[in-house]
């Protein structure tokens, strides 16, 4: 008995008018763990747990005193016990109906519904994940704005690069101008050295001119003396009107001296003219040099102003470059945050894909389970209808048997003295009852064989029925006391039945609520499936967008790196250019300061030279006048000498 397998679930067809009391024995062991619960959920229509094999004691009824009035049928197995009481006229309205029947399948359904509710809760949590996806979409929009800012910053960088190129061109032009200025300054220095030499030459020429002028004056004075001597001799000769050889020799000698003096005077005049021409040329050159010096000073001032303007531009460009570097840093930070957000999007995408896969698998499994439950419900309804038909038949048979038993009990009460005959009659009746019970058991066995193979328990029930029939012989004497106890027990059982009916009604209402919730859950599942499909499509779109964003981010990173390298190179070039410009400017300042310090004395020297030149011009004019006068006197003397010679001849 103990080694037998656990009994399958029990299905009973009972008429609506017959009250049914079901006792289910539960084992004293602790409740099953989560794994056993999962197994029961997987099985769907699993077996009931075996209870401890303890038989309940049935009150003993002595023979001859058993009244089968209000007696019911009792059946007890290893795990179940069935008490069937006849319908009471007083309590017909409180009978158990077909809708009030509670089985373990409903408990299984309830557990499944609880699991469905848990799954619905998981679906709601997944809806929270969908809200998280919406937040991710907002983040992607923020990334788009960041990319627009990157594009704007790129445009600004391009504009700044163009401005830097223009500034670099201007710097190249300024460098060329500086080179030209250096060359011109070198020329000025050379010319300055030449001017010093020229000053020395001018001083030498001035001294030479003064010497020549002194010579010309001395020559003129001597020529004048000779002319005076000639005039004196000629006047003396005119007065004397005689010419001796000495006089002729004097005249010839004075004539020769005059000619020599005139020749020397002509030579000195020629040299003076050449010197004056050279002096005039040098003056023109000095004027030209002064003009060039003024032009160079203007160019230097212009170069200084341009240099200051370029320095201001360079300072502005440096500030712009610093701003651009700060923008690049911020953009790098934004790109880093965008990469981190893309990584988080990828991780969330993978997590959501995994959740979608699990959700699809759960949805498929739930749909299969729902279909199986619907099939099982339809099958159970058919089986319940069949069981109710069988229970009506059994009820009719039990009613007839009860009437016969009541009649026999009354006859046994009246015929207490004839116990042997009554015992034989009772034995016969019991044999008939046994045969009828055997028939009922055979029908029950057929019913059990239909549902989950109850043939193993049918033999046990037959043995128990035989034991009960043997016990009934001994319990007939105690029937009166047992009737009262039975009434009390029946009252308690009826109260329990009322409680069970109320519980069954509550369970039925809960079942209806669960059905309604199932419909709502199915609708929610359909909506969730449609939302899942929409989410899949949106995820695909987001994957494409993420790929495009990744490509754009890579391009922007490459461009930012190239721009940063270009900026670093431009910064280095600007630093080198600044250092070179500063060195050149310092050198130019030193040179200009030296030259200015040297040129500070030039105006005084030039003023003194101009004054000297003016004096020389005045002296030259006076000398020219004197020379013109001398030339006129010489021409007169020549004419006179010629005339005198002609007269002498």
UniProtKB/Swiss-Prot annotation:
Region forming the signal peptide: none
Principal location: cytoplasm
One Gene Ontology CC term in the entry: cytoplasm
Annotated GO biological process: cell differentiation; regulation of cilium assembly; spermatogenesis
Segments forming a coiled coil: 137-219, 247-426, 464-649
Keyword Protein biosynthesis: no
Entry's localization field: Cytoplasm, Cytoskeleton, Microtubule organizing center, Centrosome; Cell projection, Cilium; Cytoplasm, Cytoskeleton, Microtubule organizing center, Centrosome, Centriole; Cytoplasm, Cytoskeleton, Spindle pole
Ranges annotated as spanning the membrane: none
Region listing for Disordered, in residue ranges: 1-65, 339-358
UniProt keyword list: Cell projection, Cilium, Coiled coil, Cytoplasm, Cytoskeleton, Developmental protein, Differentiation, Flagellum, Microtubule, Spermatogenesis
Superkingdom as given in the UniProt entry: Eukaryota
InterPro entries: Odf2-rel
Family stated for the protein in its record: Belongs to the ODF2 family.
Stated role: Seems to be a major form of sperm tail outer dense fibers.
Assembly description: Self-associates. Associates with microtubules and forms a fibrillar structure partially linked to the microtubule network.
Protein name listed in UniProt: Outer dense fiber protein 2
UniProt source species: Xenopus laevis (African clawed frog)
Gene name of this polypeptide: odf2
């Amino acid at each position: 008995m103990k080694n037998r397998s656990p009994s399958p679930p029990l299905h009973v067809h009972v008429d609506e008018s017959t009250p049914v009391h079901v006792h289910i024995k539960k084992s004293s062991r602790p409740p099953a763990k989560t794994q056993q619960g999962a197994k029961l959920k997987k099985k769907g229509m699993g077996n009931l747990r075996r209870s401890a094999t303890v038989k309940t004691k049935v009150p003993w009824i002595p023979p001859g005193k058993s009244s089968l009035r209000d007696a019911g049928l009792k059946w007890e197995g290893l795990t179940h016990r069935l008490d069937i009481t006849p319908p009471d006229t007083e309590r017909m309205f409180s009978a158990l109906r077909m809708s009030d029947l509670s089985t373990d399948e409903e408990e299984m359904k309830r557990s499944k519904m609880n699991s469905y509710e848990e799954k619905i809760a998981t679906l709601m949590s997944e809806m929270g994940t969908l809200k998280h996806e919406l937040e991710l979409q907002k983040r992607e929009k923020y990334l788009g704005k960041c990319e627009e800012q990157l594009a704007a910053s790129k445009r600004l960088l391009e504009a700044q690069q163009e401005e830097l190129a223009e500034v670099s061109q201007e710097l190249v032009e300024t460098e060329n101008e500086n080179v030209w200025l250096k060359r011109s300054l070198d020329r000025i220095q050379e010319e300055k050295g030449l001017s010093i030499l020229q000053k020395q030459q001018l001083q030498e020429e001035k001294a030479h001119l003064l010497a020549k002028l002194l010579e010309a004056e001395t020559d003129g004075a001597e020529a004048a003396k000779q002319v005076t001597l000639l005039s004196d001799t000629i006047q003396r000769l005119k007065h004397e009107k005689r010419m001796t050889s000495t006089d002729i020799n004097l005249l010839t000698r004075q004539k020769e001296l005059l000619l020599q003096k005139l020749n020397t005077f002509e030579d000195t005049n020629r040299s003076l003219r050449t010197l004056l021409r050279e002096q005039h040329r040098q003056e023109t050159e000095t004027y030209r040099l002064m003009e060039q010096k003024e032009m160079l000073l203007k160019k230097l001032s212009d170069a200084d102003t341009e240099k200051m303007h370029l320095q201001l531009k360079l300072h502005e460009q440096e500030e712009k470059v610093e701003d651009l570097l700060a923008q690049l840093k911020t953009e790098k930070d934004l790109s880093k945050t965008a990469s981190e957000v893309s990584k988080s999007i990828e991780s969330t995408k993978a997590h959501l894909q995994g959740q979608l896969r699990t959700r699809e698998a759960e949805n498929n499994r739930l749909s299969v389970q729902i279909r199986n439950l619907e099939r099982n419900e339809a099958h159970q309804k058919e089986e319940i209808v069949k069981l109710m038909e069988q229970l009506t038949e059994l009820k009719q048979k039990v009613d007839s048997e009860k009437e016969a038993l009541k009649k026999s009990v009354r006859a046994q009460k009246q015929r207490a003295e004839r116990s042997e005959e009554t015992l034989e009659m009772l034995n016969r009746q019991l044999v008939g009852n046994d045969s009828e019970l055997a028939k009922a058991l055979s029908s029950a066995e057929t019913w059990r064989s239909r549902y989950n193979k109850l043939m193993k328990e049918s033999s046990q029930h037959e043995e128990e029925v035989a034991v009960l029939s043997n016990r009934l012989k001994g319990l007939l004497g105690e029937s009166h006391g047992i009737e009262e106890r039975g009434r009390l027990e029946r009252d308690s059982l009826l109260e329990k039945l009322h409680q069970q009916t109320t519980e069954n009604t509550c369970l039925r209402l809960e079942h209806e609520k669960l059905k309604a919730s199932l419909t709502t859950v199915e609708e929610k599942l359909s909506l969730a499936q449609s939302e899942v499909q929409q989410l899949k499509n949106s995820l695909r779109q987001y994957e494409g967008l993420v790929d495009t964003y990744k490509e754009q981010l890579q391009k922007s990173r490459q461009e930012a790196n190239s721009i940063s390298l270009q900026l670093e190179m431009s910064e280095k070039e600007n630093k080198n250019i600044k250092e070179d410009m500063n060195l050149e400017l310092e050198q130019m300042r030193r040179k200009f300061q030296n030259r200015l310090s040297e040129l500070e004395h030039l105006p005084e020297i030039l003023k003194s030279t101009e004054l000297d030149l003016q004096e020389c011009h005045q002296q030259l004019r006076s000398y020219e006048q004197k020379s013109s006068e001398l030339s006129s006197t010489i021409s007169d003397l020549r004419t006179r000498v010629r005339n005198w010679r002609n007269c002498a001849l």
